[in-house]
């Protein structure tokens, strides 16, 4: 992300927060990171609202930490800057090998999302939501109007912006690492990927 020109980060912590904070504080990137402990999780949108002063009025990248994404982030940012008119969010997508386990999308010829299906029995596609977004600051105003402390970005925000969400396809590597099996698999896959590209 730093190679793409991103210079400041905010990370919310909760589970095993002391270990996470200790790791980050010893990192060479520590001076670029603001750590925010949430005793009770505010959900993705709630965290954004609570830290809107950190974001100011600029577009920001919103990343779910239980994913491992390897891609050209400069290209991702460029795609957002050059997105179609009237779109306010750019969602990273990827091809999933298990579409029943995640949110899948249907997009039009312009790359704009027309349908979103969250963990359905008969998913209509294998193009999945990578839970990595570039978001215009105007979206924060909408989230604030919900008058909720806890705002789920996938449930409370994405449906409202249907037809106004552009997509960026990550064809290099993306995996949900929210459980031990997928985390171990990601280590094997990325090790192999780095060997192939080095």
Which residues are covered by each model-predicted region?
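Conserved N-terminal catalytic core of the sugar/cofactor nucleotidyltransferase
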Residues: 1-64, 68, 75, 142, ...
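A short, conserved acidic/glycine-rich loop-to-beta-strand motif
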Residues: 84-95
